[in-house]
Amino acid sequence: MNKRNCIFTAVFAFSLISAASVFAQSASQKLEHQTDEKDAPIVYFTKDVSSEGLMKVYKALNQKKQGKVGIKVSFGAPDEDVLKPALLTDLIKATDGTMIDSCGLSGNRWTAEMNLAHARKHGFDRVGSMQMLDEKSDIDMPVKKGYLLKYARTGSHFDEYDTLVSVFKFRMHFLPALDGAIKNVTLCLGSRSGKCLIHSGGSDSKHYHDTKPDVLEKSFADALRAALDYKKNWAFINVVDSYEPEDSCHGAKNTGNIGIIASRDPVALDQCSVDFVARTAENAEVRAAWEEAHQVKMLEYAENLGCGRRNYRLVEIK
């Protein structure tokens, strides 16, 4: 190893150690939206980032299996750092679930077969069966008293599932919009047409729009309301593991494996995930900048629509 590589390795290792140190020092401190209120939704957390760890928090949710089980994941782009398929092994065995996703707007995710090819490349086919929801046609899910959308749109195969489990690789410092459970069951659940509706605030179902943040945040909230009303039996799991930040946020770092978090409340789950990552910010001003950059206000809009609550009780499972 040459001198330059040695220096890079040392710096990278130091950054991971520093992130772990921050996490350890604050482990006994309450998170930003953590509460002791008895009526607050429960969020379960384990540091065990494994298939067994994921099953621990899933079992704690006590979701009753009804009919066919769909496990909503994102198969991702060809070179994307996606959820590790092996984490789903025990969940799929326990539920006999099918991994489901929808097509994307980019050229390499345009068709069902393209997406399934990426899924096979990432290894999802080695842990269970897969289905693209929108390989045939679309269905509309009504939005009741939303901000902008009249309906959200996904693939017609979604009607085949009665029990839904969202499992997502949570990333705060990735794309502009927060990468969590809400995104997984709104934009990622949407068919190509459904994605266009969200990006346009409901005005266009055929073309992508580079939308203002508040329009996108409200559209996410509307689409979440639609998904929760259309299918009642949901569980939500975020895997908050190691990844390299891909944005320009000041002070953003690889936090290493924080853990796996689960809840029946998607708003509480995403807020808790944000709180775990955002507490590594060097001060309140930096945290606020991170949250603004990644449109965290969508959680407030979703809460106001009755999709969940941002304050939560945290229960650690060891």
State where each predicted segment sits.
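Boundary at the C-terminal end of the N-terminal hydrophobic targeting segment
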Residues: V22-S26
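Bacterial N-terminal signal peptides that target proteins for export
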Residues: M1-A10
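Extended, low-polarity segments enriched in aliphatic/aromatic residues
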Residues: S28-K318
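Bacterial N-terminal signal peptides
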Residues: A10-A19
